[in-house]
Amino acid sequence: MEEKGSRMVQQGNQEAAAAPDTMAQPYASAQFAPPQNGIPAEYTAPHPHPAPEYTGQTTVPEHTLNLYPPAQTHSEQSPADTNAQTVSGTATQTDDAAPTDGQPQTQPSENTENKSQPKRLHVSNIPFRFRDPDLRQMFGQFGKILDVEIIFNERGSKGFGFVTFENSADADRAREKLHGTVVEGRKIEVNNATARVMTNKKTVNPYTNGWKLNPVVGAVYSPEFYAGTVLLCQANQEGSSMYSAPSSLVYTSAMPGFPYPAATAAAAYRGAHLRGRGRTVYNTFRAAAPPPPIPAYGGVVYQDGFYGADIYGGYAAYRYAQPTPATAAAYSDRNQFVFVAADEISCNTSAVTDEFMLPTPTTTHLLQPPPTALVP
């Protein structure tokens, strides 16, 4: 019995010793997939599992773990994780690089928009005989032209102008080619036109106390200066902000011995149609009635359009009439200046015949047989 027991112990020991031989085998190192896209793997090989310190029979679930070691599972998942990290890293770099690539693309688009905008050139020292078609022909070879303008004054061309191109690139090319070229003995200068700064200049009132300054002597002529009656025609812009002065002055000039028609009293002067702008001024001298008129020699009714028409726009057509005995009263002073106080004589009168109209650049006169003009 003892021998059988010792044999059973030995057999048990032998069976127990066989099990550790099977469990003592270390796990094989995991076989990782080769690196992809030339990027080295960021992981290291796992350490082998240490041998178990116990001895004994293993259960079936443990053998299933040996058939599917966790290292193998780790080796299969690690490359996927690495690939995911690699892809995400690449995507991040692409996103970061996207704005960098987009910035150069934005700048050319802005340059393209600037080149497609119109541009104006200032052309100076051009021949004085040049007109707009000549300047257009000179610059038209470089691109489409929107506008050509040569500056003129009353004497002719001022020798410079402006050319507007539809495309700024064409304008730059024309400036480079034509700047400094000699045309008819004159060196053309082409530069970029600069924007003109408009300043609010204070308008100088040419009137002193509402009356026009004489452009020759600079004296102020008003009704008080002439001892008599003045007829002031109503301005066309009455009631507007521009209506600040009389538009015309109607008067007659006389010489001693050349009387003018007598008329009714000064009460015939009714200023209702003058809207308060006209006024009658009486001098301190005796208002004597002149001698009977000379039928063959009449007066001259003169209206200077410069007083109203040229400054404030005035009337489109000047209206003039000669006073008649029924509508005018003559007052004379020691200098024999006669001023007509009229009722219906105004800028609106239509009693004018075209045969007496003599147009001039600034004035229009209603002339009768010309008198001998003497300066008093």
Swiss-Prot record:
PROSITE patterns: RRM. GO terms for biological process: mRNA processing; nervous system development; regulation of alternative mRNA splicing, via spliceosome; RNA splicing. CDD domains: RRM_FOX1_like. The keyword Protein transport does not apply. One of its GO terms (molecular function) is mRNA binding. Residues 72-89, 102-115 have a biased composition (Polar residues). InterPro entries: Fox-1_C_dom (IPR025670), FOX1_RRM (IPR034237), Nucleotide-bd_a/b_plait_sf (IPR012677), RBD_domain_sf (IPR035979), RBFOX1-3 (IPR017325), RBFOX1-like (IPR047131), RRM_dom (IPR000504). GO terms for cellular component: cytoplasm; nucleus. Its main location: nucleus. It is found in: Nucleus; Cytoplasm. Residues 90-101 have a biased composition (Low complexity). Keywords: Cytoplasm, Methylation, mRNA processing, mRNA splicing, Nucleus, RNA-binding. Residues 119-195 form the RRM domain. The record marks R120, F128, R129, N153, K158, F162, R186, R196 as: Interaction with RNA. The keyword Cytoplasm applies. Residues 1-126 are annotated as: Disordered. Binds to the C-terminus of ATXN2. RNA-binding protein that regulates alternative splicing events by binding to 5'-UGCAUGU-3' elements. Prevents binding of U2AF2 to the 3'-splice site. Regulates alternative splicing of tissue-specific exons and of differentially spliced exons during erythropoiesis. This is RNA binding protein fox-1 homolog 1.
